Amino acid sequence: MGQSVVVLGAQWGDEGKGKIVDLLTEEIGAVVRFQGGHNAGHTLVINGKKTVLHLIPSGILRDDALCLIGNGVVISPAALIKEVSELEDAGVEVRSRLKISPAAPLIMPYHIALDQAREKAAGGKAIGTTGRGIGPAYEDKVARRGIRIADLHYPPQLEELLRTALDYHNFVLTKYLGVEAVDFQKTYDEALAFGDYVQPMKSDVAGILHDLRKQGKRVLFEGAQGALLDIDHGTYPYVTSSNTTVGGALAGTGVGADAIDYVLGIAKAYATRVGGGPFPTELDDEVGQGIRDRGAEYGASTGRPRRCGWMDIVALKRAVAINGISGLCITKLDVLDGMEKLKVCIAYEYRGKRTEYAPLDAQGWEECTPVYLEFPGWTENTHGITEWDKLPVAARAYLRALEELAGCPISIVSTGPDRDHTMVLQDPFA
């Protein structure tokens, strides 16, 4: 507990982080995004009104919250402009409260072209990216040919960087992937225009965070995707292109390890996954379809149906361990209402042996067969319940079992999409 809290996904993403971030941003100094791009879709429902954010921190709907985008985030100019415009049209003040690190890399048109052409060429072996250029933008960052926010304000340098990048990427696009080249002049002009647009928002995010900590202000670090999609610790190669784990909050903003006081891991009461990759507890039957329908399990960014399955404690314990999770938030408990029985994977059968540890590669995960523990379901309606004692006995027993099996206390339970459909058992900021 303390003044700086990291909120991150403890599964494969889509756990409901946006709502929880919004809930915790009352009396907040700042909310900061530290990795990913506009492939994240954070859905907020406040008083019945739905808002989907892809790039801007979820705290933007709090009038007094400062919203920061750190150096670890890759920024699509078009996506940022669109999101700012939509929020401002809805009466939300954005540009005076949004601060963006000059070290944040840009997603350029050639990154999008590469992403989409590669996925198409891969066919059945595609990773299942959103096709929005996230991965190629991170590739350029590591290869030191990326274009960052800071570069937009030095036209001669920008021109040189862009020509070098296009010489490389257009060769790959035309000669290897067989698609059209990206035009230099159009890309250059658009980049310059975005430089003018973003200039008032360009700020030293790390410096702001250090100052806020000195002032004793609350800061919330908002993760995107989930721990099991981490480029290093996830089901590689079926992962995202950034560090979605707690280390990403440090490297992606410029703060030290002592700046983090509490790590809140978000997990659904069951499990979902989008795109390719191993998913040991996946349900390819009417039970899985029922969960998908009741939980509206379709991507906020892409609309793709999510794969659904039982809670996987082996995977959850891995997320708890690699992130040093202080407390869990279990979301979508109400989706399980009316189910006669529930299953929880407590171990895997892997190459003839039982193990409680997940393999470190996708092929190993594919070979795992879940070992289940069965729990009674409940017929009562839990939707919108905000008091622990009012939950059905079976629901409370299920949550306590998850807590014990994961070896981590449950701090928050969500029983519906609205901000108010939540019970806080332990305030991370208390």
Swiss-Prot record:
IMP binds at residues 14-17, 39-42, 130, 144, 225, 240, 304. Binds 1 Mg(2+) ion per subunit. It comes from the Bacteria. It is found in: Cytoplasm. GO terms for molecular function: adenylosuccinate synthase activity; GTP binding; magnesium ion binding. Its cofactor is Mg(2+). The active site is at 14 (proton acceptor), 42 (proton donor). This is Adenylosuccinate synthetase. It comes from Xanthomonas oryzae pv. oryzae (strain PXO99A). The lineage of its organism: Bacteria, Pseudomonadati, Pseudomonadota, Gammaproteobacteria, Lysobacterales. The gene is purA.
